[in-house]
Regions:
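Hydrophobic alpha-helical transmembrane segments
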Residues: 1-23, 199, 213-237
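Interhelical loop/hinge segments that connect adjacent transmembrane helices in multipass membrane
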Residues: 15-60, 103, 111-114, 238-249
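Interfacial transmembrane-helix starts/ends
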Residues: 39-43, 112-128, 135-140, 157-160
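Alpha-helical transmembrane segments of polytopic membrane transporters and translocases
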Residues: 48, 63-65, 77-93
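Interfacial segments at transmembrane-helix termini and the short loops linking adjacent helices
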Residues: 73-75, 113-114, 139-168
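Membrane-interface junctions at transmembrane-helix termini in multi-pass inner-membrane proteins
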Residues: 165-195
C-alpha cells in the first residue's frame, strides 16, 4: 500500500520540473498571475462540484456497507458479482463519454448548439445500443455466472434485473451530467444531489428490508430518478434557449 501510494507522488515530483521549467515554462503557475476578481466565481463553482462529489460518494459507495450490515458479507459477494458483470457496460460507456465534457465546454463557448445537439443524439443512440447489449447480457447471465464462479454461488435473476436497471440509469444520467458540467450550469444537479443524498439511505434501507439485497439496488436506482428527469430537461431548455432562473445557474 505504501509503494502504491508513493508511486504517483514520485512521478509528479519528477515530471513537474521537466514540464514547467523545461518544456512548457510559459504554463508554470505563479502567484503574480493570480487575479482575485475571478475567485468568487471559481470558488463558487468549485464548491458546487465538491458537494456533488460528496453526494455521489454517499449514493454510490455505501451500497456494500448497507448490504453487509443488513444481510451479511455473503450478500455483498452476490451483489458485487452481479454488479461487476454489468459494470462492463458502465466502463465501455464511460470511455465513450469521457471526451464529452471538454468538447461540450468548447462548443458552448462558441455557441455551436447544432454540434452539441448532434453529439448528444449520437450519445443517446450509443446508450440505446448499450441497453440492447445489456438485455442480451441479462438473458445469458445465468450461464456466465456458472462459468465464472461455478454453481456454489447462486445469483438471483431478479438481482441481475435490478443491477441492469441501475447501470442503465447511471449511464443515462452520466451522459447528461457531462453536458451540464461542460456548460457549467450545476445548480439543478446540486439540488438533485442534495435531495437524493437525504432520501437515499431511508429508501434503500426500507427497500432492502422488504426485498433483500436487491432492494438496496432499487433504492440506488430511485435516487437517480431526479437526475434522469431534470438533467435532460435542462439540456432541452438550453437547446431552445429558454434557460431561466435556477436552470441557468
Amino acid at each position: 500500500a505504501f509503494v502504491y501510494s508513493l508511486s504517483p507522488v514520485i512521478v509528479y515530483l519528477l515530471a513537474y520540473p521537466f514540464t514547467f521549467y523545461i518544456k512548457y515554462p510559459n504554463l508554470r503557475p505563479t502567484i503574480y498571475l493570480v487575479k482575485i476578481k475571478y475567485a468568487k466565481d471559481l470558488l463558487g463553482l468549485g464548491l458546487q462540484f465538491f458537494i456533488i462529489q460528496i453526494g455521489c460518494l454517499i449514493l454510490f459507495a455505501t451500497a456494500n456497507v448497507m448490504i453487509s450490515q443488513m444481510f451479511g458479507p455473503d450478500q455483498v459477494t452476490i451483489y458485487n458479482l452481479s454488479y461487476k458483470y454489468f459494470s462492463v457496460l458502465t466502463m465501455a460507456f464511460s470511455i465513450v463519454i469521457s471526451p464529452l465534457w471538454s468538447a461540450i465546454t468548447e462548443a458552448y463557448v462558441r455557441k455551436d448548439f447544432k454540434w452539441i445537439q448532434m453529439v448528444m443524439k449520437r450519445m443517446m443512440s450509443i446508450w440505446l445500443v448499450s441497453i440492447i447489449v445489456g438485455v442480451f447480457m441479462l438473458l445469458f447471465s445465468g450461464i456466465v455466472y456458472r462459468i465464472w464462479v461455478g454453481s456454489e454461488i447462486a445469483i438471483p435473476f431478479s438481482l441481475s434485473i435490478v443491477v441492469l436497471i441501475y447501470v442503465s440509469l447511471n449511464a443515462w444520467t452520466g451522459m447528461f451530467a457531462s453536458f451540464v458540467n461542460g456548460v457549467g450550469k450545476l445548480r439543478i444537479q446540486l439540488y438533485c444531489t442534495i435531495f437524493s443524498s437525504l432520501f437515499f439511505l431511508p429508501v434503500a434501507i426500507i427497500m432492502g428490508y422488504l426485498l433483500g439485497g436487491g432492494g438496496v439496488g432499487i433504492g440506488m436506482s430511485i435516487a437517480l430518478v431526479p437526475y434522469a428527469i431534470l438533467l435532460p430537461l435542462q439540456y432541452k431548455k438550453l437547446l431552445s434557449k429558454s434557460l431561466r432562473g435556477v436552470w441557468n445557474k
